[in-house]
Amino acid sequence: FYQPKWISTHYTLLDLRNLNLPSNNEIVQETIELVLQNNLADDGGIQLGPSTSEHSDVCVNGMFLNYASYFKTSEKKMHSIIDCLLNEIMADGGFNCRTTRSGATHSSLHTTISVLEGLSEFQKAGYTYRKDDILSVKKSSIEFILLHQLFLSDRTGQIINKDFLKLTYPCRWKYDILRALDFFQYTG
C-alpha cells in the first residue's frame, strides 16, 4: 500500500484525486475498498506496514480520508479514520504525525494541511459523522496555519523551512504555501 513510496498505491490514489479523476471511477473505488479491508491499524487508522499496525500515521490518515471521500467511499467505513484523526488533535490546534512515533509536542504544517484536506473533503462529500467535532478541529487547524502566516515560526518570526516557499507538484505529504493557498481557495 505504501511501498515503494512514490509509486505506491497510496500516492497513486492521492495523485488521481488531485488530478480530479471522475469520482465514480469503479477501479479506484475497488482499490480503496481493498485498502480498508486489509490495512486498518488497531487505532482505526490506516497502517502502512507491520511497524504501524498499532498506531497509524496521522498524515497518511488525512491523505487517505481526502481521496476516499472524494471517490465516494461509504461514510460508515471511514468512521474509524475520523475517530482516529480527531483523537490526535494537539493543544496548539494542529496535528503532527510524530506524536505517535517520537512524542512531538508542537503541530506540523505538513501534517495539519493533510488532515485539513481530508476533513474538508469528507464534509464536501456530504458526510455528517461527527460534524461539529470536525468543524471545531478545522477551525483550530486553520488558525494554526494562519498563526504561522503560512510559513513563519510563531516563536521567532523566521521562515520555518525554505522549502515551504518552493512551489512543487505533486506535493505528496509536504507542505508549501501553494498547497495552503490551494486549500483555502478550494474550501472557500
Predicted regions and their residues:
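Preference for long, amphipathic alpha-helical scaffolds in soluble/luminal domains
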Residues: F1-G188
